[in-house]
Each structure stands twice: as C-alpha cells, then as structure tokens.
UniProtKB/Swiss-Prot annotation:
The chain crosses the membrane at residues 1876-1896. It is a single-pass type I membrane protein. The keyword Membrane applies. Belongs to the SIB family. PROSITE patterns: EGF_1, EGF_2, VWFA. Disulfide bonds join 433-448, 450-459. The keyword Iron does not apply. Residues 423-460 form the EGF-like domain. Residues 1-22 form the signal peptide. The lineage of its organism: Eukaryota, Amoebozoa, Evosea, Eumycetozoa, Dictyostelia. It comes from Dictyostelium discoideum. This is Integrin beta-like protein E.
Amino acid sequence: MNNLFKFLFVLLAIFCPPISDLVVSHGVPQQHITIIKFTTNFAFRTTFYKTSSSSIVIGEKITLGTLTFGDGSSTSVRASVTSFDTKNDWFFGQFIFTKTYTALTPNNSKQYLAMFTSCCRISTLLNNKDADWNITSSVYLDNKNWPSVNHSPVSGMLPIVQVIANKNNNFRVIASDPNVDDKLSFSFSTVYPMTQPSGMKINSTGHVFFLPTSVGLYSTQIYITDDAVPPAYAVVDFILESITEPGKCDPSCSNGGATCNGNSECKNCANAGSTTSNTCSTTNYPPYFVSPTPQDNQLIPFTVGQPNSITLSCKSDYTTRTVGIQAANVPAGAAIAEGTSSQGTVKNILSWTPVAANVGVYVTSIFCYDSNGLTSSSRSFTIFIAKPECGNGHKDPSTGKCKCDGDKWDPTSNCFDCSTGYYGQNCDPTPPCDKGIPNEGILGDGKCMCINGYSGDKCDVPLSQSCKDLKNSILLSTSVPSFFVNPTKVQLYIESDFALTTSLNIPQKLTKIDVFVLVDVNVASSTLFGVVQSSISTFVTEVSKSICETTQFGIGYFSDASSSGFNFAPGSIIGSNIVNTINGYAVSSYTSTSSGNSLLGATNAASNSNGWNSGSFKAIVVLTDKDHSSNSAAITNFVNTYISNSIAPVVVGFGASSIPNWNSAISTADFGYSTVSAATSIDISAKAVAGLKSVLSNVVYKTDNTTNGASFVKSTPSDVAVSSTADTVKTVSGLVLTKPSATSIVSPVASVSAIGFGQTDFSINYNRPPTPTGTAFSVNQNSFATFKLTGTDPDFNILTFAFTTFLTSDVGVITDSNNKDVSTQKSKYYDSTETFTFTPAINYLLPISVSFVANDGCLNSTTSATVSITINKVNQLPTCQQKTISPTLNVANKFVLSASDFEDATPFIQFTSPTDLTAYGTLTFGGVAVTSTSKIPTSSEITFTQTVNPTNAIDVPVSFQAVDSVGAISTSTCTLTVKLVHTNIKPVSSSTSPISVIPRGSVSLTLVSTDSDSTSAKFTIKSVNKGAKGDFYTCSTNDCTCNSTQTNIYTSISTTTTYTSISYTNKVANKLICFTNGEPSAISNYASISFTSTDNQGLESDSVNVVVNIVGNRTNVAPVVTKIQGYSVYQDYLDSDAHVVTGTDADIDDYNPPNVNNLIAIITTPPSNGILVTLQNGSIAATQGKAPFTHYYRPNPGFKGTDSYSYQVVDTFKAGSSIESTTVTVNPINHKPSVVVSSYSFTSQSGDGETQDLVTSDPDGDSVICSVVSIPSQIGMYDSDGNLIESVPTVLSGTSYSFKLLDPSKITPTPFTSVSSSFAVKCTDVTTKTIPFGTLSTGVVTANVQYTYINTPPTTQGGTVQLDQDTVKVFTFNGSDIETPKDDIKVKILSLPINGQLLINATGVALTTTNIASETYNLNALSYKPNAGLSNWNTIDQQSPLDSISYTVIDQQGLTSDSDIVYFSVRPRNPPVYTGARVIDVLQNTRYPLTITSRIGGGGSEVNIQVIGFTNNGTLSIAHNMGSEGTMDSEITSYPNQQSGSTSYNYAYMPPRNKYGNDFDFIYFKLFDGDLYSELYTVTVNVIHVNQPPTIELVSYKILDGVSSEVLFENTSLINMNINTTVLIKYSGNDIDVDQVTPLISMIPNFPLRGSLYAYNPTASNSSGAPITRNSSNVEQNADGFYYVVFVPSKKTSGESYARITFIMTDNGGLNSPIVGVLINVNTVNIAPFVIIGNKNYTTQTNLTASVMGVQFDDPDSTTNNVSIVVSIVGQKDDKVASLKDIKLSFTQSPMCEYHQTLASITCIGPKKPLNSSIVSISVIASTAGDYRLKLFVDDLGYNAPSAIRAQSHLNATGYVDVKVNAPEATTQTTNNKTVLTGAIAGAAAGTALIAAAAWKLLRKAAPPTDTFFSEAAFLGDGVNANPLYEQSASAAENPLYQSASDNTD
C-alpha cells in the first residue's frame, strides 16, 4: 500500500473566542457566540502528495479532505504546511476556519459534533490497520452564559513518537486550555470505536506508560477534556513507532562500533564464545535536550507585536555525532533558524513576532536525533499569546484610548483590525481597485471585487465593447499535456465562420489505454463460455504484449437470453484483473436463443462510469455470439453515446456466420470496428486485438449531437492516420465553428470528439441582440428635464440608441447635447453617454412618450422601449403686461392693467410702489386710494387724476405685479408708464376795473396776462363800449399822450383789435391801452372794454371786462405804498405769516363813497424763486388786488437763499405810488428722505434668494440709515452681512438684504407649500439740522415677499438585490423625497424582469405589462422570484446579475424621479447533480460495483454524498480501492452515511444469497455542496435472476438390518455400518430457480472402489433395485421427492473410509450442483463382554475378612487392548456405593487399579488377563453389618469399534455377588442392619461422582494419545446414573450379542 493514503496524525481543536478576541474584516457580521473558530492540525505522509519528501515547502496549501460541522454543513480542508520532516517523510499542516452556526434563541444552548473522518489508516499498523479515522470535537453553544465561553483544549504531538520495544516507555501528552483556570484530564478516546495499543496506559495527567511487545507501528487517540460544565474536549491521534533499541558492536569485533540490533550482526568477535559477554551492547545513549530548552509542559508567554524567541538545544554524549532538532506543530508565521551541529551539540532558535490575530494557545512538540539514528524522548511546550488591550498599538495615557502603530490599524477596533485601504494579517495596503470594492480588513485577501461590467485584477478592464469591434476570438482554452487531444476546453466568441486548429500528440508507444470488455454471457453452452473465458485471458496478454503493456482493463456483461436477459451489469472497473473476474462468473443458463440486445448493452456500457482514466484512449470491446436487432433510434443513441463519451467500439461476433446489423451500425457511426471470429479463444482474441489496433490507427472526428450547441459546428477535421513508427504530433485543421442564422440558444456548448482519443468541449459566445430599457421621468410644467437612453446587452457590448418615434412642436421638443432637435436627425444613433433635454410646449400637460431601439454595433434590438414623460402641473405664476397712459392734468384718467394666469381667469394687480405716481396726482380704485397692499382684479378700471403739472414732459414708471388667487406673485415686475406732459395753463387776464377818468380826460389801463408757462401773449379785444364820446386807443409811443388827431400814432381800438407777441416777463405780459372821453361830467359805467389773452401755445384766458367811470374833475394825488420789511421763511414751506401790500392816498376822501380804500395793490415784480399766493394753502398767484392785499410767500421746491419781489399801490385815478421791494430770506431745512422697497418673489428652485437693494435718496444729500421694522413670517430675512434678522427693529449695515426659506418641512399649516408675507423698512437721514426739526424718516414702507414652493421630484438610486437561486426575495426600492413620507412614495415599474417575476407581496400575484402600465406600488410591496433553476450561473460570464428591471419613484404630487435600474444577483444554489443510472440491474448472487457519479452544480465548489437510507434486503458497502491490493468493502451499518471530497463515490451492492426480483432494494441518497442539498435520489436495484446451480442435501441413512432406525446426517457426512450389512442413503436435490419445473437429474459422478450401488426398490426384500453403474449413473427421484441409493459392501470386508459415494444434481439449464459425497466406514462387530460369577452369596461377620472367589469376566474380541472394570460394594438397590467407613475391599494384586479415597470402589484399566488375575480373590471386611452386593462392572472401551465412533461404541456387562455381613452374636441387636446400611450408603452419596471421576482419570491415563474419549464434563453431575461408566450400551438391548450380565449369569 505504498501508494495509498497514509494518515499519521490529526488534531482537531475548537477555539471559541469571546467577542473581544475576534478580529473581523469589513463587511463581516457582528461577532456572536455562534461564531466558532476551528483550528485543525494534520500530519500526513509527504510522498502521498508530493513526488519526494523534500519537495514540500512551508506555506504550501494541500487539500486533505472535508471537515463537517455537525449541522449538515462542511468545508474542504486546505491545510497550510507549517513544518516537515524529510527523513521520516511527514509534513505538518494547519487549517483554520471560522464557522457561523445558526443563531440561538434567548437563554438557549445547543451542542454540535465537528468531525474529520475518512478511510483509511495505514495498512502496516499493528492495530486499527485500514480502519477509518474519526477525529471529533464537541461545540457547545450557550448564550445564557455569553460572553463567558468555554474554549476547547489545545494539544500538539509529534506525528510519530518512537518507543523502544520490550521496554517500559514513558512520555507525556501535552495540552493547554485558553481558559487558563480549567483543569485538563486525559484518557483513551472512546468517541469512536478503535483498538488502543496493548500494554499502553495513560493517567489523568497525560502521562503515558507503554511496554510494546512488538516492533512496528501502533495508532492511538487520546481524549483531552476540561472540567467545565459542559466540558469541551479535543482529541489527538498519532502513531507510536516501536523500534528495537540499537546497540554497538563490541570493539573486539571486526565491525566494532557499528550500529547493531542483535549479536548476530557483530562479526568475528573475540568474545563470541563467551557465555556472559554480549557482542552487541545497548549501552548507546540517545541525544537529549539541555538548557535553555523549555521543559516539558512549560508555558511560555509571547507578546503581540514584539519579537519573541525560544532557544532549543540538544546534546549527545558522543561528540563525533551530528545532532539535529525536529519540530512539529510550529505555529504559522513562526520560524526556526537551524544551527550547525558541533561537538555533539546543536542550538536552534524559534522566533516569532505574533500579531493580534495570533492570540491563543499553541502546543509545539520537538525531539532530538543523531547521526546514528537515535532519537530523544519528545518534549512539548506551550506558547501562550495573551490578548493585548490594544492589538497593534498601545494605550495613550493622555486619552486612555488605543493608539495604533501606524495608520494601517483601525483605532475603532482597538487596533485589532485594519483601517480602510488595508488587508490581511499584516494590514498591507490594498492593491489598486479601479471599478470595484477591495476585500479589506484583517480577514480580507485584498482582491478587487469588480462591479458589474468590469474585470481584471484591478477591475479596470471593461467587459463592454462594441459588437463591430469583436472578432472571432478564443477567450480561454485548457490544454492538458498528458492528453492526446488538445485543447480540451475552449471558450470562444463567434462572429462568423471560425476555423480552429487542435493538436494531436499520440506517442508511438502508447502508455495510457483503457479497454472495457463487454461479454455476452448467454451462449449456447458452457463449453463455448469457457472459450470466451479463455479468450479474455489471451486478449489481455496479447494487448499487453503487442499494443501497450500498461493497458488497464475492465469488464461487464449483458445477456441476450430471451426470457431472463439483461442489458448491462458491471463486473469490475478499469484497472481490475478481468481474467479473475470472468473466470469467477457463474453463468445462469445456456441457450441459443437471443433477444438481440447486444447494441443496447453496448450503449449502457458506454453510459456507465467504468472507472475510465483521464487522458487514456478508451475502447469498449463487445464479444457476442449473436447479432443485434435494435431499431434506428437505438442505433442513433448508440452512436451519440460513443461520440459524447469519446469511446471507440470494437465488436467481435464469435461463432456467428455474420453480424450484418452490427456492421451496419458501425458503418452508420462511421467509426469503430466490427468483425466475426471462430468460436475459439485464439481467434476471438486475435480479432479483438485486430479491432483495437484498427481503432487505434485512425483518429476519427465527430460532433456530439447531444449538446445544445451542436448546430454551431460547421465541419470537423478529416480523419488522421496514426503512425506506427513514430509519434503522431500534428496540428489538425478543418474544425470550423459558425453561428447559425437564427438561434436563441443561451450559452451553447458544443463538443467534438476524436473517437477514443479524447474530445474538445466548446463554450460558445455569440452576439445576441441588445434590449433597450424603458425609462420614465417627470418634468415640471413649462420647465425642462434631461434624460439618457439605457439598455442591456447579454454580451456586454457598448450600445448606441436611435429614436423611432418623435414629438411634434405642439407637444414639446427633445434636443441633444448640441441643442439639435432629434426629430430633425431621425436616422442618427446616439451614444449611451448622450444627454437629451426635453422641453414641453408652454403649458402642455398631457403624458408624452417616444420609442427607441438599442444597437450593439451589429444588431438593433428586436423590440423598442419607451421613454414615458409625465408633465407635472405646477402653479404657474401669473404674468402681467406693460402699460402706458398719458393723463390729462386735473382730469380723471381711467385705465385698465392687464394680467394673465394659467390657472386663474382673473388674477390681481398689485402695485409695488404706488407712491411713485401719487406724487403727481391721485390713484384710486373704486374710489379708494391705491396702496402697495391693494389687490386690483385685472380688467378693472383704475383712476389716475393728475394734479401736478410738471415743468417738462416726464415718464413716471410705476411698478406692479400680477398676483394669483393663492398669492403667488409674478416673477417679473411690470411697469405702468405714466407719460406726464406739461399742461399749458391758460393765461389769466386781468386789469383794474373799474377805472375812473375825469371828464374829458384820458386814462390808461393795463391789459395784464399772467402765465407761468408761456413766453408771449396775444391780447384780443372781445367787446368795446366806448360810450357816447369816448374812445379806447393806443399810442405808438406806448403812453396816452397822443390824441385822435395824431392819426399816425393814434389807433382806435375795436373788437377786431389784437395785440400779439407780448412777452411775458416774470410770468406777466402787459399791454397799455388808453381811454379818452369827451364827457363833461362824471358818468358811472360810462364805458367798458373786454379782452382775453392767448398764450403762445394757443390757450386763451377767460374774458376780462374793464368798466370806465367818468368821475370828478379834479387833480389827483398819487398814493403812497407801505414798505414790507424783509422776512424769512423755511425752505419748501409756505410762509405761515400773511404779508399785506397797502398804502395811503392823500385824496382818499375824494372817493365816492368817501373813506373807502380803493387803492389797488400791484405786485410789480414777482419773486424769482418762489410765488406769492393769496391763500395760505392756495395755488392762485397773488398779482394785484385791493389794498390791503394779503399774500403769502412760497419758495420754489428745494430753493434756499434770498428772493425779493416789488409792489406799489394805485389809486382809482391810476396814480401809482413808488415801487417798493421786500427781501425774503429762505432758510434751509432738513428734508425727509425717501426709500423705494420692491416686493420680491422667489421659488424653492431659484436658490436661497438673490440680494435685493433699497433705493434711498435724500434731498439734502444726507446719509440714510434703514432699519427693518417688521419681518416676514416663515421666510428668513437676512441683513447686508448675511445674518438672519430675528428681532426688529434691526438696522441694516448697508442697503442690501436677502431672503431664505426656513426649513420647508416646517412651513405651517402645511409643509412644503408657498408662503406669502410682507416686511417693512423705515429709513432715517443723518443731519445736523435741528430747526424747525432734526432727523426725519421715510416712515414705514411695506413690501411683499412671495416664496413659491415648487415640488421637487423624488430621487432614487438603483442597486443590486442579492438572493439565492429558487428563492423569493422581498426587497425595498431606494426612494426618497423631502416632501413625501417614505411610506407614501410609490414606485412605477417600467420594465419587467426577463428571467424571473416581480410578485406583489400581499397577494403573491406576478406583475404583468398590464399591471405596470397603470399601477404603482409601495417601495417595499414587491418581491423578486427568479425562474426555476436560473441564477447568475446562467449569464454569459456566469457571474453577472441574472436579471434587472427599470423603474422610477413617484411622490405624492405625482412627480417622478429619473429612472434607474435594480439588478437581481441570484447566487447559484445549484446542488450537485447525479449523473448516474437511476435503475441498476444486479445479477443474482453477484457483487455490483456501484459508482455514484455526479457533477458539481452550476456555481458550486464540491460534491459530497449522504446516503440517507437503504432498504437493507441486500448489503451496501463503501468500496475502497486499495490499488494493487484490490478493493476492500466496508459495510454501511448505520444511516445517514456521508462521504466527501470527490465527484464520484464507489460503493458495492451485494444481493442476499439466492434472492432476486424487480424493485428488490432502494438506495436513497442526497448530494450536497456545503449546506446545499440535492433532491433525494433513489437508485432502484433490480436483482436479475441468474440460473443458480442446484444443491444437494444429505438427509439420512438407515442400516437395513431390520432393527436399526433412520439416522440423520445432521453435521456429518459419515456413515458407520457393520460388516455384512446394507445401508440405504437418502438425499434431496433443491433448485431455487422458479423455472425449474421438472425433477432435477441426479447422477453418481464417482463410483466407490469397493461395494455395489443399487437403485432403491422399496418392494424388494432387500430394498435394492437395478444396479447403478458407470454406464447408468442416473438416480431417479422417488415419489416422495427424495433420492435413494442402496450401498452393499463386499462380503466379509470392512475398514475405515471403506468407500466414498458422490452425488451431483443437474438442472434443466444444464447447471450442476457442487458434488456432495458420503464416507462409509464398514465396521467389524464389537462383541460385548460378560461376567462370570462362581459363588453368588457370601455371609460373614463384621470386622472379619471375607474372600470372594470366582468372580471373572471376558471380552471375546479383546486380546491385548485395555478394558475397564469397576469393583464396588453397593446396596441391595444398586443405588449408592458404600462408604469405606462401613466396608472395605481389596485385591490380592492391583498394579493397574486405583482405590477410591472414601468409597468402597476400585477402578482398574488394563488387558483382560491381568485384570482377571487381580480379582481372583477379592477381600471384603465390613465394620457395619448389613446386606451388601459386590458389583463388577466391565466396559470394553469400544476398542473394536472404529475410532471415529469409539466413544459411542462402548459395550459393558455387570455381575453381582450378595454379601451378608452379620454382627457378632454377642452383640446382636434388634435394630435392622439394612436400615443402618442404607444410611451409610446414603451418607456416601456425595462421593459417587468422585469415584466415577477417578475411574475416568485412570482410564485417560492409560488411554493411547490418539484415542478419543469423553470429556471430564461427564462427571460433573451429582449422581452416577448420568455417567457412561454406569450405563449400559445403547446397543445392548438391540442385539443378543450385547446383552449385559445379570445377577443370574453363570
């Protein structure tokens, strides 16, 4: 078994760290009691895994088997090599695995049994050889006591511990416990049955005492447990190597000093003849450990993060020897620096700088060895690494927290785990990871886990590309150098026809050929089958000689018997000795009929797992004597099966004239070989060898049509001839793959087979059309939105997209990134990165959709997808229209301002600063003055009355806004432009009236026109009443000095007279006219004249009438004007004091009426910078009037300084006074500043609000300071510095301010709504003026602020949902919206998954396209269910997400998010798949090698098997292939039974003897991968009836002597009969076959040499019928169903083993039973002995000797042989032997006799003559009177019977002599002596058995060694009646010769 798996040592320890001990990587679930760390240590033979013991390296990973966890899950064990020993050929490995068990319910506990088990132990073990090993440990989970965790013990031993044979050895098993207070206890393991070494003991402290009695290997397993409750345990399993202690040859020997194991190995020694000297001395001391090597069981603490070292030192007392140290179970990461041996000493240094992850207990074992092969005892010590407070750091005393050693350690984990960006035990920097997530953390491996669409170590290789960029390419190929055909596996992409070359590498000398022979076991005769058996032997020999000597063979059978045939049954797998297999095959029947199933058998054989070797040429040789009769479908299946398995068929029809059907099938296949042969072993073998050579000579390529990608194979290579003289190394062309024109196969797989030589499997990728992904989004009314087109491609090609439908302009427009309308580029394809902008038509609200297709560079998608657009209705802000009006001064001007709103038919108008207009007049609506808060319905009349006439035309802008019904204000401000023009004020005409003129006198009068806005005037005379003698005239001299006679200068005035171009000076134009009259006396109202004045702009004043009175006739005195003293007024203020122009007139008394002041005051020069008005608040200019003429001075606006005006008084005679002037000083005052505050509106989408400015002004140029005196509600107002204004008043540092909305979710009463509010500002100037007042303010100015909340669309982010295959996963869409509670957000599905379903959680109903078109769902309302059996494994790269959907989320207001995608990553959960047969046909009484074949499930990693149950009619075993030692079956005795670590598992099924039938047994099993279990598979076992040979049973025999009874044979086949007798032999024949309906034929195959046989005739006198001879050997069945023969020995002959008679049965199938025989002893007759008694009665007295004479015996047929006699004194009833206390007897001579010690009995053995001499005189003396009998018992010991029955053939005889003993007469008493004697005899009863025993011992002593005797057990009873010495022969009553002697014998 050198090539077999050698298990040396396994230790399984469970380390259950508390939560603080665990170091977890990023993403690992939180630590818990259910997280268990397993540490397993293994030692195995290095050369089982490696080519040499030195080819292994530290750190190498080696797969060893499977560790099961007790919960149905397991993991593959890949141990990391930690140490090795090249000399002893072992390595030590460690495997650490962290297992998470199912969470426990509160206050609960659970126990699991972890196990590492397999077969087989090394076969050279002295105990437990070839047995399974079972290494276990218990896991106890208890969350009641968490985090107090009981850790299992930890131990370590050398894999092989050497001990000295036949000496006491003592060593210690070392173990430690992480729970340092736990006490450990050691014992032999009883966890699993095993045999511990004999002579080995272990105490509870771990001390082992071992005295091995043999040299060799022992295995042991030690159980180590702690004292916790419940306890935790571990086992350590290791090997003890018992060796002979080596010695040294004596120096006197020729090889003195050499190592020896015994004296014989020391040659030519001088002291060889000495009887006391030992030429091989064992005083040879091994090396030993010296200080500072740690002591056994020493605990050595190591510190995390610091270098630690241990010195190991070994010494030998022999300085010339080289010594070394071997260590085992060295912790991973620790290193041993080996020193150089010098002077018999060596030092090694074990060094280790442990990291935090190494916290724990480590037991390391060491031993010394020297160059002479001596080893020290092993020593073990414990390294204990305590958990530091700060793993890879230290505690900072200033903070009390952990400070890590560098940035790579994470302080939040107390420096036990890596920081982000680091991985592994040393927290190395993670490699670059471009498009992925690095596997970080202390348990991470640093690998980059790519996101979908990327690959490569750095995840920087995009998987996507354009189809047009792809060419035919091989993505991956696998070549196996040892295979004939390469590559074996190819993954490729096909765009068009692709020619692929393969290679052949067939050596001239083939070394790998597998041949499976399929034998037809239904042949015409046993002779022909014998030929077939011989041909197999010849075939194997010839193939090995002429083709390949390393060919491996297997064999199987089929039977074409018409009634009981079968298609296929395996015999033995490839690599077996098929010659032995076929020679051991028992044929059930021989028939010449055939069912023609040979082709079906060949198909089944090719489908079976026959143990083919990888890389071998595979052939099946079919040997059949009949042609097949299968139909075309079966032939097609045959061809496909051989192609798919790459097997070459060779068919030999032996003994058949032709096999045309087989020839046709091989021709159809176009490969293989068929021929016929003669029915001889030589020809059959020759034809089979020729066929094998034929299929080996040519490589035929065929496509496997059973694969789903067979249509992709366009052509296969042509046949290739295999060279017989050289290696066939060739590149083969002709294999062309193509893409079928129309295919939808997902992941096609094709296979091309080089028949027999191997095959190439193709995983094919090809371009498939992409799928566009619909999207949906929403856009706000009159806004815009951007979107992209998306899609998926199964081949990850880069996609472009094209629209297939387009929008019309009345709906909206879609533009690309270049702002081009896509509808104008209808054939354009856009990249996936293109961003489109959709702008809906103004106020368009209906849903919109457009369609598009995806293109992968080669193909358009077969369907289009839709972009669905929802336009969200948003409250549109109203708009207003500009307006211009041109009012008329002092005229009510009515106008209408226009505004519009999408929602409101009648929005409102609101002026933002109406004071801008009211400075020029009044602004009213409905009779009420308009303010900034007035809301005026649109289309309503507004009235403006201009009251201020500007000097020049000006445009007054007045801002206003539109406001809708919800208070939303238009974003833009409109302007009402009021065009104010200067209104020409008509002049005011005036003149003094009446005027007086003296009779015949003249008087002047002045036509006055006052006008403030004209430059010249025209006076028009409207009427003239001259009076009778009067005239109105003018003089060209501008005075009244001319008269009518002076016509040249005198002009009379008439109604047509006008005076033009009279300039205004100081707003006054004057025209002097004159009146003259000729009346002599005064006349009142004498004349009159009326006139108007017209300014140069055409306005005419009212008409003024001047009346002329003719008065008096006297001399007038001019009046005197009163001077007004200078005064002062305040700027911009009307003088509050009245001033009067008046005067005095000297001749006032001349007036009529007298004393009336008729003076006229005239303002001759008005003020230049102000006006004089007649009323304090009036507007009528004061020009003249009756004196006293009151007036007020009003300075012009803004004027300050001095002004003056002049004045005079005129009397009624127009006599004017002098003109006086008065100076007015206008003192400056402080003016009120002004501020313009605009209303403001902003939205939630316009940011936080723009900065606004106050427009301030001050007429005096003073600085203006503004304060906010009221703030808006729910809208934050910020000052010039950006600080929130929280209290009022607040002074602004500048004139700017801004607004921000406070938290929109806190708007009341409804969050996320619009807010209308107002704020107020008050500004003051900065002045030094105090009179008449100081600082002035603008007053409170209020403005509106409008915040319009525009609903924000929700947001979402796609993701990946992880779930397992064939499960349903409830998931939640990612969706958020600031306005909408999460529970109210809905999701709209845009596309359904392709490979699964979306289900409604509440109902389980699957969504359809109809559902998703109209319905929305809660974010958590759906679940995903993949289609059955589908997972990521079914994608092109077998790892991409299986499915995806596109979706969008919708808020409460109907706004939708951008669409996104949810991917469904379905973890493959494909259990392993059983690929073998579900029904097996097993031949009756035949072992069936059952191989459970399987394949790893898609995405899986391993295949394990668990046999669940078995119906147990037959026997199911695990078949262990022991290589050259054959196969060993170990019966499965309990279920479930589990195996791991392969994809095929070998079992053996054996039906019970002679049982058969369909559905005979059922084998139930599951395959599993980790915790993933397959369906329950059932293999149905049909046990096929095979004709069984009949059997013979010997029943009985009877001696035909008339008296003998029938004797059953029972357990013997021996007949004892006497000489000259006849025996009748009875036997039966049986056949279990139900088809055996006729009686079996019985024959006598071998006749006895002596005696005669006869048929049985019960009617004959001697029962003998016809003689049975060699020519007539049949024995007919009797009517009772039995067979009888009569045997008659030859007369007068006898002897042991006299004759042997054999019988055989033959069934109707021609099968013979095993031969059964009887052995007959013909014995001579043993003659019974007899007793001769002379005197039968004697009388004597007590204490007197009586001599009994004449007692003799004879045995007629005894001469010199021994006989036995017993002479005893018994009672009258012969029931008890008398005691020696009562009576004694003796012989005159007794050399052959033995006296009983307590009873009156003598036993003698010897020939009869000396015995008779001994009893010639028998002395009897009694001390007790009574009636006695002397008894002689004779036994001939059966010596004349055959020795075999001697013990049963004893004959005997008995004789009696009555002896009456009387008491002396003098002492005679009346008491009955018989009674006394009876009591004496009764007292002696206990001794009877002793007498018999003594007799037996004597007999045995005298018996010859070869004699057979009864055993001592015969004498163990209480009485003698059961003793054969005391019984008559059973034959004595049947034959007079055997009659025993009686009392009357003479």
